[in-house]
Amino acid sequence: MMMTKQKNTLAERLNIGDEVRELKLGSTFNPKNTSTAFHTIKYDFKPASVDTSRMATVDVGSNNQVTVIVPNSELALNVRLLIFGLTESSGVPHTVYKGNQREYAKECLMIYDKETGAITIEKLNHNIQVKKTRTEVTNKPVQLPAQSVPMNMGHQGQVLGTNGSVPPPMAQLAQGPLSGPGGKLENSTMRVSSKTKVSTGSRRNNIIDFKPRNSPMQQSSPSRPVVTHRSPQSAPAWDANNAQQTLPSIPMITDDDDFGLRAALHNGGQANISGSSTGSSSGQPDLYGSSSSSHMGKQRQAHGKRQQIHQRSSPPVQQQPHYQQQQQPNYGRAYNGASNYAQQQQPQPQQQRHSPHQQPHQQQHQRHSPQQQQQRHSPQQLQQQRPTSYGHSNNMPMDLDSSREHDLASQSVAQAAAVLEQQIGGALSASSSSSESDSSDSDSGSDSDDSTEDDRSMKEQQEQQQQQQLQHQQLQLQHQQIQQPAPHHQRHQQQQSQQHMNQLPNLGLGSISPSYNNHHNHQQPQPQPQQQQMSGVYASNGGFPNDLLQNDLQLSSNSSDDDD
């Protein structure tokens, strides 16, 4: 078995004979040389699609950055199109390498010329190491040289030299199997591993600018609203094309329209409930004025919901009689004025005691005057006799307005209690004096008996008439409850209590101000039980219900019969 001897020596590999040859120094050893320079390029991977018959370009940039662009063969591109089904635009015409360069210190290159057999030694200038980039340049054209550069090829196909001593920015190199200084071929397909990462200039991070959708802002209402129907701006409807489309707006009564709603309720439903309060139907000017504060759309919607719930559970509007408005003082007076008014009215029971027969005469006069009874149910008189102290509460906040209404209600209740005490005292004195006079005159004759019988018949007729009036007022209250809502409980409860106190007969007990104040403090969170127990409002306020009043009247009539 014969063993072949490996060619380990340089002479054997170059197929040079044993003869002695002359070794020449190249132009790079000449200090005056400025036209010739030699470089080495080392790359990690060479794809099979590289066209070795075409020229490659080397671009030396700033900071020793080098870019090598190697053209690919058209045949390889067509094969890729057929195999992978790629389009023409996806075919990559170039292979791009990027890396850096460093200078050589004492490295040389030996060049052997096969034709002449001469051997020349040249200095190496730079060592270039590049790597294949992942993204390949498709828009960068290949820079072909204007004229061909003579290249000296070695025995193994190394690049031997160019026409510059310094590394030119664009060195035109003949493509072939490149090797390092040791002459090792680099045509294998093995990828050389390295820890360095090459930053590619062709890779661009496409930053997507996300522009926020500019939804239309909810504009606040103007500071001085126009007396028109106002509606809050509704939220824009969702659209994929971001079209600013708004839903149709619905007129809504806001927090600013409390005074207008109050005026409309006092006018008996004849005023127009809108964004601003208007005058009453009887030609009365607007006492409360238009609203001036503004709120956002969300607060308006929340207030609209609260107002709807409030209107469902609110008691009906209680209209005051005409004569009661004439007897009541202005709500703007202080509590001291109410006490002074009560002190001034104290001599009245004494005058009534000396005239016991005056009260039946007044009751008879009230029975024969239906015009005064009709005035109790007329909303026109209520509109004309409405107090004007609320005209200055236009710009007050809602909490101050409610506290002031509470104070005014307590003052008016105290005044009404004082008047009621005086009337009750006078009635008791009159009844006692009448009973004494009847007992003393029982033996005088048939004239006194006839007068007492007339008085009792008058009392019974008056009781029946008052009961009919109460039933008529209850029916009217139920009718008003269906037609018009009442958002303000305090004022209507005050009017209702005052009307019932004035409609009570002149028989009863002491003051009702403590119990009424306690009931007034708890009336706002419980409007529905108060409305349902309309018939028993006298018992809750410290007075008597209708049944108790009727029983007391019967007892008084029986006592008068016993005295007779």
Curated annotation (Swiss-Prot):
InterPro entries: EAF_fam, Tscrpt_elong_fac_Eaf_N. The keyword Cell inner membrane does not apply. One of its GO terms (molecular function) is transcription elongation factor activity. Residues 297-309 have a biased composition (Basic residues). GO terms for cellular component: nucleoplasm; super elongation complex. Pfam families: EAF. It comes from the Eukaryota. Residues 179-255, 270-564 are annotated as: Disordered. It is found in: Nucleus. The keyword Endoplasmic reticulum does not apply. Residues 438-453 have a biased composition (Acidic residues). Its main location: nucleus. Coiled coil: none annotated. Residues 186-205 have a biased composition (Polar residues). Belongs to the EAF family. Promotes transcriptional elongation by Su(Tpl)/ELL. Essential for development. This is Ell-associated factor Eaf. It comes from Drosophila pseudoobscura pseudoobscura.
